[in-house]
């Protein structure tokens, strides 16, 4: 099942934290979705998507646990794959990435962490979105 893995490592205070991995079948699904971004294809591949959701939830949960070793993460949000098409000129129904946000405990802490996984470009972000 895990033919190839993406491994995220965070180095904090000379301690290396190993994170859960994203299986290659998740990346392959996102590649296929980009080529076939329509409801018929998605419905035919709904079982694959359900399996990937479990993998992503496990990954996000382990990332949250690891972040809590050095921070105070209050909650985790995994964003929906369905796009909001109401005001968009681009009518493709699905996102071709998986995004997740890790919110720090409030009101003591502000800011947070964000991970986005896609077949082309994945990234990790930390800090504040639109701070006042």
Regions found by a protein language model. Name each.
Residues 53-105:
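Extended cationic-aromatic binding surfaces that line active-site or macromolecule-binding grooves
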Residues 31-67:
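Contiguous, amphipathic alpha-helical segments that mediate oligomerization or scaffolding
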Residues 86-132:
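Aromatic- and glycine-enriched beta-alpha-beta binding-site module
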Residues 21-22:
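Well-ordered alpha/beta subsegment
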Residues 25-30:
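Short, aromatic-enriched amphipathic alpha-helices that serve as compact interaction elements
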